[in-house]
């Protein structure tokens, strides 16, 4: 893999984003959805 294309930095920056940031965002949105959808008894 050579850095001859325009967005050569993209795979390097997408690895921590997809491994760390994406699960945190998904878990946060899922937590907000579950807590807002919970019946208030």
Swiss-Prot record:
The chain crosses the membrane at residues 12-32. The keyword Transmembrane applies. Keywords: Membrane, Photosynthesis, Photosystem I, Thylakoid, Transmembrane, Transmembrane helix. It is found in: Cellular thylakoid membrane. InterPro entries: PSI_PsaI, PSI_PsaI_sf. GO terms for biological process: photosynthesis. One of its GO terms (cellular component) is plasma membrane-derived thylakoid membrane. It holds the Pfam family PSI_8. SUPFAM superfamilies: Subunit VIII of photosystem I reaction centre, PsaI. Belongs to the PsaI family. May help in the organization of the PsaL subunit. This is Photosystem I reaction center subunit VIII.
């Amino acid at each position: 893999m050579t850095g001859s294309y325009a967005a050569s930095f993209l795979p390097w920056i997408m690895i921590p984003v997809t491994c760390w940031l994406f699960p945190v965002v998904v878990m946060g949105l899922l937590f907000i959805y579950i807590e807002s959808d919970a019946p208030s008894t």
